[in-house]
UniProtKB/Swiss-Prot annotation:
The name this protein goes by in its record: Putative ATP-dependent RNA helicase MJ1505
Reactions catalysed: ATP + H2O = ADP + phosphate + H(+)
Family the entry assigns: Belongs to the DEAD box helicase family. DEAH subfamily.
Motif stretch (DEAH box): 137-140
Entry-linked Pfam families: ERCC4, Helicase_C, HHH_5, ResIII, RNA_helicase_helical
Keyword annotations of the record: ATP-binding, Helicase, Hydrolase, Nucleotide-binding, RNA-binding
Residue ranges constituting the Helicase C-terminal domain according to the UniProt record: 338-516
Species annotation: Methanocaldococcus jannaschii (strain ATCC 43067 / DSM 2661 / JAL-1 / JCM 10045 / NBRC 100440) (Methanococcus jannaschii)
Binding site for ATP: L35, S36, T37, G38, L39, G40, K41, T42
């Protein structure tokens, strides 16, 4: 059976009762839908879109976390929805911002990554009021500072909401945060244990495969462990940890943060030792779980770092011995050979079988793909976009990789980028190169095998290593999440109901107070009207008075209608150019200024044609002094006419007080750059707005990037020349040019003529003429 609906093409969407029930409930309230992988979250989204658009006229936005997933939703909606295909639009960062602004006017349904929508909200390219539905696919991302959360908060009070996820997590407070950010009023949950979904769930068998490490690895790991224990002993002797046994990375990260509050005499050495211990622990895990090449790459990266902790590890005798031992050995991690053997065995039984291998690191993905290819197996790489090292796949390459895998590939070797939502049908075998401690990622990886007829999931575990702990952790968290999901509907809906009842009480209270205020205003107005009427009765009413009354009523009505038609996003009086890397600050600023995101060569914020601001957090300020980046950045900042440095926060504890004072004095005296300290991001934003207002409103200066390749327009050049005159700012330069028409006329004008311009007194006119006529003494 198929769904029959005027907005859904015939025989394109299978009719499943549980999907229809969930969609019907989701149309009544803002809903978070938690549905196991393979149960058709996209189908529910389509049913809700069709339902909403049948009742209301407006636009729909679907958020998806990756570009390939955006493309997938786009193709599926075009295939199923009975809507003009030109009205269904996929938006990515590849489309120019101006073009996106035009597309928002033309389209009906938009599919985009949250980062694109976030940028367009900040820059004022999208009108949120035009949307009647927001669908957040993979809604578990709607937490913290994620772009999902920013977009959700902008939309939740404006339109209907549907959140979709297979794995919201095992912490009910985190799930409540997701609900809060999306404005969720109701939760729908279905797991593989629910009777109405059981017929559609594929059975998956989880098979752990434990692998012994080679002797060369064990000897190298022993040396790294000894180096690690030396650091942990220092921390224990200092009394900051209780034992050197079973210390976790999480505990060391927490300790590192605590150490900043310790006395100056001891904290720097302890922070260094703690940082070394963390790096050694990470190196150890890489060798245990990933292999020799990934471990050696990490040590090589440390050798290129300037920090004391990195140098200490690279120069450590035991670490050097471990590195030499591995470099001389031809042995690689036995997981690699095991993967090749497993793939061969599966394909020998069925040459048309499809297999997905998940590996956490890109280096490991490359290694696996190369090994499989050498063994005559068609392996396709699937990784995320370019990172700091420049490696990665473009959106086009990702989509092509999925299509190749569907048509001709036997094995897809992937990082976590393919865990979410990518439609790869009929996959019966999954191999985890390593276990992941996150229950969300564990479920999503395994879920790739729940879409076909069911299958097997193999997890490779290096015996006696962190792999064992991560595997146990993932299983425990998954059990906890399932337990939570069973009670989630009841618990969450109860919490949400309580929350909305409290909100309603508050709203009723506010409304009551508002009504009382209006009653008082109304009584006052009635008294005044009565008084006016009494006065009018004293005068005879003429036909002219009657006509005037009708004209006033008609005019006020037509003006009201005109206002309703012309309501748009209010234009903000100032503009700020913000560097693309400063997006969090742009989020704070966009409510008060028009924001243009741009890659800036110098500084972080352009507030006018002469003021450019570099912003640093206290931590970054300290780090940039230590690694000597700061002074090269300040040399660049000197390119602008009026540079400014803002340092935000109060945590300067990593740097000695004398060194900090010396750096501040050098910035002010040697570089001539003013420095302002702020407590937090909000205070910084307020300061930036005030400077921009002064420059643009009071001084009437334009906002432009004056350094680099950008050339000034003729008008800007004229203004720039006139501003060079004594006591002439941006506003006065503009008045002089408007009065005299040309720069030449300004420069040849006599004192009396200059004084005719507002703001030019006798003294100022005299100074201007003196500069223009005095002989140059070379």
């Amino acid at each position: 059976m198929f769904i029959e609906h005027p907005l859904i093409k015939p025989k394109t969407l299978e009719a499943r009762l549980y999907q229809q029930i969930i969609a019907a409930n989701a149309l009544k309230k803002k809903t978070l839908c938690v549905l196991s992988t393979g149960l058709g979250k996209t189908a529910i989204a389509i049913l809700v879109i069709a339902g909403i658009l049948t009742k209301k006229d407006g636009k729909v936005l679907i958020l998806a976390p990756s570009r390939p997933l955006v493309e997938q939703h786009y193709n599926r909606l075009k295939q199923v929805l009975n809507i003009d295909e030109d009205k269904i639009i996929a938006l990515t960062g590849k489309i120019q911002p101006k073009k996106r602004a035009e597309l928002y006017k033309k389209g009906k349904i938009f599919i985009a990554t949250p980062q694109v929508i976030e940028n367009d909200i900040i820059a004022g390219r999208i009108n949120v009021d035009e949307f009647i539905l927001l669908i957040a696919d993979e809604a578990h991302h709607t937490t913290g500072d994620h772009a999902y959360a920013f977009v959700a908060k902008k939309f939740k009070d404006k339109c209907h909401i549907l959140g979709l996820t297979a794995s919201p997590g095992s912490d009910i407070d985190k799930v409540m945060e997701i609900c809060e950010n999306l404005g969720i009023e109701h939760v729908e949950v279905r797991t593989e244990d629910d009777e109405d979904v059981k017929p559609y769930i594929a059975k998956v068998k989880l098979i752990p495969i434990r692998i012994d490490l080679p002797n060369e690895f064990k000897r190298a790991l022993k040396l790294i462990n000894e180096a690690l224990k030396e650091r942990l002993k220092i921390l224990k002797d200092a009394g900051v940890i209780n034992s050197i046994a079973d210390v976790t990375k999480t505990e060391l990260i927490e300790l590192n943060n605590k150490l900043f509050s310790y006395d100056e005499e001891v904290k720097y050495e302890l922070i260094k030792v703690c940082s070394e211990a963390l790096k050694l622990m990470h190196a150890k895990e890489l060798l245990e779980s990933q292999g020799k090449s990934v471990f050696l790459n990490y040590i090589n990266k440390l050798s290129m770092q300037r920090t004391k902790s990195a140098k200490s590890i690279v120069n450590d005798e035991k670490v050097r011995e471990a590195v030499n031992l591995l470099m001389k050995s031809d042995v690689e991690h036995p997981k690699l050979g095991k993967v090749v053997d497993m793939v061969k065995n599966i394909l020998e039984k069925n040459k048309d079988e499809r297999i997905i291998i998940f590996a956490q690191y890109r280096d490991t993905v490359e290694k696996i793909v190369n090994l499989l290819t050498q063994n005559g197996i068609k392996a396709i790489r699937f990784i995320g976009q370019a990172n700091k090292e420049g490696k990665g796949m473009s959106q086009k390459e990702q989509i092509e990789a999925i299509e190749r895998f569907k048509k001709e590939g036997s094995v897809l070797v992937s990082t976590s980028v393919s865990e979410e939502g990518i439609d790869i049908p009929s996959v019966n075998y999954i191999i985890f190169y390593e276990p992941v401690p996150s229950e969300i990622r564990f479920i999503q990886r395994r879920g790739r095998a729940m879409r076909g007829e069911g299958g097997k999931v193999y997890v490779l575990i290096a015996k006696g290593t962190a792999d064992e702990a991560y595997y146990r952790s993932a299983l425990y968290k998954e059990r906890e999440m399932k337990r939570l999901l069973k009670n989630m509907c009841y618990l969450l809906n109860k919490r949400l109901q309580k929350k909305f009842e409290e909100k309603s009480k508050e709203e009723i209270k506010e409304e009551t107070e508002e009504i009382k205020e209006k009653e008082i205003e109304s009584k006052t107005a009635v008294k005044e009207e009565t008084k006016e009427e009494e006065e009018k009765t004293k005068k005879p009413v003429t036909i002219l008075d009657f006509i005037k009354q009708i004209e006033v009523k008609e005019r006020s009505k037509s003006e009201e209608d005109k206002i309703k038609q012309e309501i748009k996003i209010p234009k903000k009086p100032i503009k700020i150019i913000v560097d693309v890397r400063e997006k969090n600050m742009a989020k704070l600023l966009h409510n008060y200024a028009n924001i243009e995101l741009k890659t800036l060569e110098v500084g972080d914020y352009v507030l006018s044609d002469r003021v450019v601001v570099e912003r640093k957090t206290a931590e970054d300020f300290v780090n940039s002094i230590i690694d000597k980046r700061l002074f090269s950045q300040l040399k660049n900042l000197k390119k602008v006419e009026k540079p400014l440095l803002i340092v935000e926060g109060e945590n300067f504890s990593r740097l000695h007080e004398n060194a900090l004072k010396g750096a501040i004095l050098s910035i002010i005296l040697d570089f001539g750059i003013p420095i302002i300290f702020t407590k937090n991001a909000e205070e910084t934003a307020d300061l930036l707005i005030k400077i921009a207002e002064k420059e643009q409103i009071k001084e009437k200066r334009t906002v432009m990037v004056r350094y680099g390749k950008t050339a000034m327009s003729l008008k800007e050049q004229q203004k720039f020349i006139v501003e060079s005159l004594p006591d002439v700012g941006g506003a006065l330069a503009e008045r002089l040019l408007k009065h005299f028409k040309t720069v030449e006329n300004v420069f040849t004008a006599k004192e009396e003529e200059l004084m005719k311009v507002e703001g030019v007194g006798k003294e100022r006119a005299k100074k201007i003429r003196e500069v223009l006529t005095a002989e140059y003494e070379g």
